[in-house]
Amino acid sequence: MSTKYIFVTGGGTSSMGKGIVAASLGRLLKNRGLKVTVQKFDPYLNIDPGTMSPYQHGEVFVTDDGAETDLDLGHYERFIDINLNKYSNVTSGKVYSEILRKERKGEYLGATVQMVPHVTNMLKEKIKRAATTTDADIIITEVGGTVGDMESLPFIEALRQMKAEVGADNVMYIHTVPILHLRAAGELKTKIAQNATKTLREYGIQANMLVLRSEVPITTEMRDKIAMFCDVAPEAVIQSLDVEHLYQIPLNLQAQNMDQIVCDHLKLDAPKADMAEWSAMVDHVMNLKKKVKIALVGKYVELPDAYISVTEALKHAGYASDAEVDINWVNANDVTDENVAELVGDAAGIIVPGGFGQRGTEGKIAAIKYARENDVPMLGICLGMQLTAVEFARNVLGLEGAHSFELDPETKYPVIDIMRDQVDVEDMGGTLRLGLYPAKLKNGSRAKAAYNDAEVVQRRHRHRYEFNNKYREDFEKAGFVFSGVSPDNRLVEIVELSGKKFFVACQYHPELQSRPNRPEELYTEFIRVAVENSK
């Protein structure tokens, strides 16, 4: 079977939920027995989002092979339950950088390097590479931003050329557009959707399907009007309404025959998607019997997307305990030893996620200290693990001023130090310890029990600093347990305190591998204990 290509674009405005549409369609097609992969095109000039502020971009999602990517890849993985790779996120910066390297090497044989054909050819190559490296039957490529944006023009042109290159039966264009709801007048306006589709047509692409983003349902008459003006079959005008839970969306799209229309267009003979298990999960999620409050102490809490995988992993873990997770967003900058009880005291558990830089670290340390002294279940992630060690060094070992070398190069007690292979690294982007690495678990530890007594777990990392082994013996003598280490025993992966309800921190990012129907084990145990703690 020829590889099938589905392209998801957006018009009218950004943040239309294209990623969720792509992920939901991917789930439906996977449940038809098809092998699906998904890819995100980001037209910005950064090589990747690794050095971008979370306030600009939200979370950086890390793949197994160590690519720092757009947060939409997290949606793809969680919805479809697949592991993506470095070919699943392509930026203008990455493409232009590669083209310029080739030009300097003389690989273009003296040609004038241009947007067409050189940039567009490379973009088409990236699409095909993502499909071939995963042996996918179908690749869904989402283009970030809005059709008509200056920076996205080469991407749209590459998508246009794909139809001629691989055949009309192997390509489908899905355009996501807004329907404006004027609440005061009680009216729905379609002009933005019509103009957005017209703009796409001006670039040579006729949409085969429209996905309408709306707060309220549209009428059949309005659907037919949009279909006529946009030259799309009425049945291929799909509504994506606001929902209570994101995981309802695949079911809503299936109810409108979206996946069948896609299969018919691409001439795919695939059985109907069996969504019974997914439907049961959604029904469970919407009828949780308990509630648990978790304090998330972070420095980017003004933008929840900065912690989207963390919050989703907490929710997934809640599903396993039949509990809705109520997140109390606590700005680490506001936390002190004096007010920490007031800010997190009513939470059944505390999570301290990752981050970079000095700002907010003392607040995180205060929250960790509060959890340790008051036996509140606590989970630390990445920087959260490093600051767990700093807090213990200061307040249990008496090492006044102990810190991470990253945050205080003058500290007398650098309990967190730079990794040996990072000492001479000068570039900031793409040089961290990234991707999947194993952790060997300690017998009898809380971590090993959480991971069902596994000997080794593999989880994704994103860090440059590590626990300083010079202090390991002193920590162990004081009761600090190193419950997960690298197979060569050099890198500390998990730490914990015994005798506590749950006091565990890990260097890796377990949330990146959590799924709604398969929650990550460390998160699951944390929430299970927190639910018990809230009784």
Curated annotation (Swiss-Prot):
InterPro entries: Class_I_gatase-like, CTP_synthase, CTP_synthase_N, GATASE, GATase1_CTP_Synthase, P-loop_NTPase
Binding site for L-glutamine: 55, 355, 383-386, 406, 464
Activity regulation note: Allosterically activated by GTP, when glutamine is the substrate. GTP has no effect on the reaction when ammonia is the substrate. The allosteric effector GTP functions by stabilizing the protein conformation that binds the tetrahedral intermediate(s) formed during glutamine hydrolysis. Also activated by magnesium. Allosterically inhibited by CTP.
Residues at the active site: 382 (nucleophile), 509, 511
The enzyme's E.C. designation: 6.3.4.2
Catalytic activity from the UniProt record: UTP + L-glutamine + ATP + H2O = CTP + L-glutamate + ADP + phosphate + 2 H(+); L-glutamine + H2O = L-glutamate + NH4(+); UTP + NH4(+) + ATP = CTP + ADP + phosphate + 2 H(+)
Any further remark recorded for this protein: CTPSs have evolved a hybrid strategy for distinguishing between UTP and CTP. The overlapping regions of the product feedback inhibitory and substrate sites recognize a common feature in both compounds, the triphosphate moiety. To differentiate isosteric substrate and product pyrimidine rings, an additional pocket far from the expected kinase/ligase catalytic site, specifically recognizes the cytosine and ribose portions of the product inhibitor.
Name recorded for this polypeptide: CTP synthase
Organism: Lactococcus lactis subsp. cremoris (strain MG1363)
